[in-house]
């Protein structure tokens, strides 16, 4: 769990029953806050450089699919231009328990991901990997969303050379 002014990050245990519930927090001074929570297996959210769910994704890219050392976002949250054919690893949450096919839509083109699941190093962090189709060369600005079990993520921005 992480608590900051105006933000609480927590991981829901996998054995929690799905449905509507509530989250209750108690501050050091005893102040109690409550809020609704809709618990489900899939709730795809792509992390972004700005940290607010908008702009370029918190992601890395690779020319060969092996070494992911190309940043996908500038410090201000705008997208870095990537080559068509690059591999991309997006990070987020709410991906790992999908029961059906996953789709990435980038610049209006549907892409089947190469991998969807737990990132493997950090609790609750999920990842989805894909290759930018060569058909998107020269596209420029491109919107990206992922769809898992008929649920769609937040829209993020990418740029294709």
Which residue stretches match the model-derived regions?
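A sequence-level detector for low-complexity, Ser/Thr- and acidic-rich stretches
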Residues: 1-161
């Amino acid at each position: 769990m992480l608590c900051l002014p105006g933000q609480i990050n927590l991981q829901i245990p996998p054995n929690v029953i799905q449905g509507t519930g509530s989250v209750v927090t108690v501050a050091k001074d005893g102040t109690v806050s409550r809020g609704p929570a809709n618990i489900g297996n899939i709730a795809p959210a792509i992390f972004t450089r700005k940290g607010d769910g908008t702009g370029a994704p918190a992601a890395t890219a690779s020319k060969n699919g092996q070494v992911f050392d190309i940043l996908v976002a500038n410090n201000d949250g705008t997208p870095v231009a990537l080559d068509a054919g690059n591999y991309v690893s997006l990070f987020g949450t709410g991906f790992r328990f999908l029961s059906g096919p996953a789709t990435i839509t980038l610049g209006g083109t549907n892409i089947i991901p190469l991998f969807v699941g737990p990132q493997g190093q950090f609790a609750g962090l999920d990842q989805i990997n894909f290759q930018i189709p060569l058909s998107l060369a020269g596209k420029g600005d491109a919107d990206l969303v992922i769809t898992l079990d008929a649920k769609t993520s937040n829209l993020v921005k990418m740029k294709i050379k």
